[in-house]
UniProtKB/Swiss-Prot annotation:
Side Cytoplasmic, residues: 1-6, 85-92, 144-160, 234-240, 293-305
Highest taxon of the lineage: Bacteria
Organism this protein belongs to: Listeria welshimeri serovar 6b (strain ATCC 35897 / DSM 20650 / CCUG 15529 / CIP 8149 / NCTC 11857 / SLCC 5334 / V8)
GO molecular function: metal ion binding; oxidoreductase activity, acting on NAD(P)H, heme protein as acceptor
GO cellular component: plasma membrane
EC nos: 1.17.99.9
Chief place of localization: membrane
Entry comment, domain topic: The N-half (TM1-TM4) and C-half (TM5-TM8) domains are connected by an intracellular loop. Each domain is formed from four-helix bundles and they align in a pseudo twofold symmetry manner. The N-half domain is the substrate-heme O binding domain and the C-half domain is the cofactor heme B binding domain. The cysteines of disulfide bond Cys-35 and Cys-42 may be involved in transfer of reducing equivalents from quinol in the membrane to the active site of the enzyme.
Active site residues according to the UniProt entry: E59
Pathway field: Porphyrin-containing compound metabolism; heme A biosynthesis; heme A from heme O: step 1/1
Chain's role: Catalyzes the conversion of heme O to heme A by two successive hydroxylations of the methyl group at C8. The first hydroxylation forms heme I, the second hydroxylation results in an unstable dihydroxymethyl group, which spontaneously dehydrates, resulting in the formyl group of heme A.
Localization per Swiss-Prot or TrEMBL: Cell membrane
Residue ranges annotated as Extracellular topological domain: 28-63, 114-122, 182-212, 262-271
Gene giving rise to this polypeptide: ctaA
Annotated protein name in UniProt: Heme A synthase
Length: 305
């Protein structure tokens, strides 16, 4: 059973990664209306080879991979619930994974049938990364990563725990601003990075405001992440799980900044934009894992005593 769970959890992560990629691809290529206003089929029927368009194919494939991923997520949640029922985080994570998967699908359906609001569609991406993060956490528990890094002896102080919780919430909000950039079609609102002609110019449109707000949010995220990394290496260097996680998070945020800048300089190159979406999804999942470790800190302290 354990071997099956390991293989299944990896396959589920791969499936959900494809879903995240697919959602970003739908947005980047303007394929959201590729299947008309019917759901789950395309214009009320299966796609026929005689009338396939790139937009229709992308949208239909996204719906199909979402359906397949739903099966993987539900099976993983049920098996983890049964096999790891003695772990206190298992049931909440399984519920979150399935619940947010359903919400994500319903929001996608609503956007197709009743039209798309950029602010709601930006939240659609936010829902998907919560589902993704919960699946990653279940997989890490299945692979017993805690034992490999001796995380069971990890004790965090209040300052670090609060910073990790707050940073994770803030990262989610920063992700929302990035998704809003895509859905408001503001990617090239300010075509020079970080500012136009090297200096700040007052925005004069909604797209300008959205783009500037995202860049400021991203800058704050980088600074905050550097601060938390400094805290970890100053006070918690003996815990490999923390130092490794923070180094990995710095790598993710550096790649995120680079792909963000390149997105502007390349006129929103499709592959760079997709990488930009995937990297922040993985960073959010990593921060959620740190939140999981922080939530165990008190019980670890009591057990060690």
């Amino acid at each position: 059973m354990k071997k099956f769970l390991k293989v299944w959890s990896v396959l589920t992560i791969i499936c959900m990664t494809v879903v995240v990629f697919g959602g970003a691809l739908v947005t980047k290529t303007g394929s959201a209306d590729g299947c008309g206003n019917s759901w789950p089929l395309c214009n009320g029927q299966l796609v026929r080879l005689t009338d396939v368009t790139p937009e229709k194919l992308i949208e239909f494939m996204h719906r199909m991979t979402t359906g397949i991923s739903s099966i993987f997520v539900i099976v993983l949640a049920i098996c983890a619930w049964i096999y790891m029922k003695n772990r206190r985080e298992t049931k909440p994570l399984a519920i979150i994974a399935v619940l947010f998967l359903i919400i994500q699908a319903l929001m996608g359906m609503a956007a197709v049938v009743w039209g798309q609001n950029p602010y709601i569609m930006a939240l659609h991406f936010g829902i998907s990364i919560i589902c993704y993060a919960s699946i990653v956490l279940l997989a890490l528990m299945i692979f017993e990563v805690d034992r490999k890094f001796d995380a069971r002896n990890l004790v965090m102080g209040t300052k670090l725990r609060i910073n990790i919780y707050a940073l994770t919430i803030y990262t989610y909000l920063a992700v929302y601003t990035g998704a809003l950039v895509r859905h408001e079609k503001a990617s090239m609102a300010v075509p020079v990075w970080p500012f136009e002609n090297g200096k700040f110019i007052m925005p004069d449109s909604v797209q300008d405001y959205v783009q500037y707000f995202h860049r400021v949010a991203a800058f704050i995220l980088i600074v905050w992440l550097l601060y938390v990394t400094w805290l970890v290496f100053r006070d918690y260097r003996r815990y490999r799980v923390l130092t490794f996680s923070m180094v990995l998070s710095l790598l993710f945020i550096a790649l995120q900044a680079v792909t963000g800048a390149l997105s502007v300089y390349t006129g929103v190159n499709l592959y760079i934009a997709l990488a930009h979406s995937l990297i922040i999804t993985m960073l959010f999942a990593l921060l959620c894992y740190l939140c999981l470790l922080a939530s165990r800190s008190k019980s670890n302290r009591l057990r060690i005593k």
